[in-house]
Amino acid sequence: MLKLVQSFIVVSLLLILGACSNSMSGMDHSNMDMGNDKEESESSIDTKIKSTSVTQKIEKSEFTLVAQERSHTLTNNLNINAWTFNGSVPGPEIRVQEGEEVKINLKNKLKDPVTIHWHGVPVPNNMDGIPGVTMNAVQPGETFTYEFQATVPGTYWYHSHQDGVNQVDKGLYGSFIIEGKDQKDYDRDYVLVLDEWMSDPESMNMEDEQMAMESDDMEGMDHAGMDMESEESISETENMGHDMSMYDIFTINGKSGKDIPSLTVKEGEKVRIRLVNAGFMSHKIHLHGHDFKVISSDGQEITNPQVIKDELISIAPGERYDIEFIANNPGQWYLECHGNMEGTEGMKTMIEYEDFEGEANDKPNSQDTLPAFDLATYGENTVGEFTLDQAYDLSYTMALNTQKDGNEEIYTINDKVFPETESLKVKEGDLVKVKLVNNSTEDDHPMHLHGHFFQVLSKNGKPLKGSPIVKDTLNVKPGEEYIVAFKADNPGEWMFHCHDLHHATAGMVTNVMYEGFKPDFTPNPAANNKPE
C-alpha cells in the first residue's frame, strides 16, 4: 500500500490545534452533533509521534481502540508515518466469543475523521462504520461506541472506512476473530495479516498532495448529498498516487523479511493459521514441508476439506483463508508469498519447531510455478442454502469494467460510476441472485458485500463442484463470471464494492437498499464524510 516511507529518519510532528477546550463527550449511535463549533481538548489529539508497539491481543468483549499516528519500522530501519489502532500495525488482534455482546469505543486522536468497519461481520446497519451511509465520521478528539452481538464465528478484520483508500493504506486495520462455541481446539492459532508498502521517497510528496486534494475535492460525499463535480480530481489523484508497481515492501503483521517473527510449533501439534489480506494486491501463499487443509474462506467453514500439499492459495484484498496442519515434519519450513513483483520475497516467515537441532535444509522458492488452489472444486459437494435453479425474487447483473473518462481511468458497474450506479433495491426476505462479470482486460475486482454473506453458485457458467462456498468477498478475475446468491435478511443501506479501494474510490461501488429503510442518523456536511 502507499505508505510514506522514510529511511533512517526519526519523525516528529506538531499538530497545530485551534480553539482547544476540554470537551470530550462521547457520541451516541445517531452521531448527529458534529458541527465545526465543537472544540477539542489538547489531550485528545497526539502532539508527538511515538514509535509503534507490538500488536496486542484483546480477549474481552468491551474495550477501546485509539486511532493515533505512530512512527513504524517496517524493516532495515525503514520508517513510515503510520496511522494505527492502539499504537501498532496491525492494530490489536481482537478475539471474542460467539454470542457475546461486544462494545468497542473508538477514540480518535488523529487530525482527520475516522470510522471502523467490521469487514465480514454481520452487524446492524448503524454499526457498519460507513461515513455518510450509516454514520457520520468520528471527528478528531471525539469518541464513538460500536455495539453488536458476535453471532457468526469466523476470521474477520476491521479497518477504517473513512477515506479508506488512504487510511487503510496508512495502517488503520486489525484482525477480528469470533471464536465458535463448537470450535475445534488447536495447539497453536496464528493470525497473519498481509499488506504491501512503498519505499520510494517520492511517494511521500505524492501522498501528501493526494490527501490534500481529496480533502478538498471529496468533501461532502455522503449518500444524501453526493455529486460528481469532483470526479475528475478523484480520478487524477488515483492515477498519480496509486501506481501498483511502486509497492515494493510486502509485509506480514507489519514487518518484512527477517523482521517477521517465526511461527513456533512442537512436533505433533495441530496448528491453525488465519490469513487476512489487508492490502490492495492479491498474494499467493505457499506452506512448505507439510500437508494441510483449507478449512474456511472468509471465516465460513468448508465441508470436509481434503488434504493438499504445495498448492498456492491466492488471497485477494479483503479475503481471508484459514488453514490447518499437523506439525509432523520437524525442522524449519517457509511460509511464503510467490510472485515476480519486487517485494514478494519479503513476505515470508518460518515454521520453526521447538527443540529442533538438525540442519535446516528448506529454501525459499517464491519464483517457482506451483498448482493453484481451486476453491470451486474443493471440499465435499453437499447441498447449500441456495441452488441455481430455484426461484429468486430479484436477479441482477453487475458488469465490472475499467474504462476511460477523457484521460482518466475509472472503474464502472454497468458502465456507471458511483453514485450513478444502480442500487440493488430489495425487500426484507427477498432471495437475490447476482451475476458478477469482469469485463476488464487486466484488473481483478475483489467484490465485497457489506452486512450479508453470499453463496457462490457457479463459475464461468459451471456449477461449483466442491463444498458450498459462503463468502463476503469474491475475487473476479478478468474474463470471469460468477453467480452468487444471498437472502436480504439484514435491513439497511449496504455497500457492495470492489475492495481494491483504488477502484472503489474511482467509481466501482453500489448499494443494497432495503425498501422502507430509514437510517437513524442525519448526514452532517461538516463531518467531511468519505465512504471510500
List each language-model region with its residue ranges.
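Extended terminal and domain-junction accessory segments
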Residues: 21-64, 168, 173-210, 308-431, ...
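Histidine- and aromatic-rich segments of cupredoxin/plastocyanin-like copper-binding domains
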Residues: 127-130, 134-140, 149, 194, ...
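Histidine- and aromatic-enriched segments that form or immediately flank copper-ligand environments
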Residues: 29, 63-179, 282-316, 333-345, ...
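Bacterial N-terminal signal peptides that target proteins for export
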Residues: 1-9
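Extracellular and analogous surface-interaction loops
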Residues: 94-98, 263-268, 325-326, 424-429
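Acidic-aromatic/histidine active-site loop/patch
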Residues: 191-267, 276, 401-403, 409-416
